[in-house]
Curated annotation (Swiss-Prot):
This is DNA-directed RNA polymerase subunit omega. One of its GO terms (molecular function) is DNA binding. Its EC number is 2.7.7.6. It comes from Syntrophobacter fumaroxidans (strain DSM 10017 / MPOB). GO terms for biological process: DNA-templated transcription.
Length: 121
């Protein structure tokens, strides 16, 4: 189905009122992690309407769909998080290897705002 229309959805439900309630409920399910019943290429609202137009979401099965288990996190998100964790670990490892005592003497030479700068160089 290239384009979903209200007319397509109304072939599957008895009224616009029912369609709105069914679509809202399905969108909330999708946002809560419910598995999609059709190809995922659109936002939740369009996806819900596509599912209704395809006859996969009905007044009779909407409650059963709420009980379906949520999908695991999308692989792309999980991979990005793994890369971020790895980068953070590398940064932390490098930070713990860094010899902070090398610059300790320089850190002690903090110039107080009220004090005059020394003539040492």
């Amino acid at each position: 189905m290239a384009r979903v229309t209200i007319e397509d959805c109304l072939k599957e439900v008895d009224s616009r009122f029912t369609l709105v309630h069914l679509a809202v409920r399905r969108v909330l399910q999708l946002r809560g992690g419910a598995p999609p019943l059709t190809e995922v290429r659109n936002k939740e609202v369009v996806l819900a309407l596509r599912e209704i137009a395809a006859g996969k979401v009905t007044v009779d099965n909407i409650r059963r769909l709420e009980e379906a288990k949520a999908l695991p996190e999308p692989v792309a998100v999980t991979q990005k998080e793994d890369v971020a964790r790895l980068e953070l670990k590398e940064i932390m490892d490098e930070a713990t290897l860094y010899d902070a005592s090398m610059e300790f003497d320089e850190a002690q030479q903090v110039v107080e705002p009220d004090a005059e700068p020394s003539e040492e160089g």
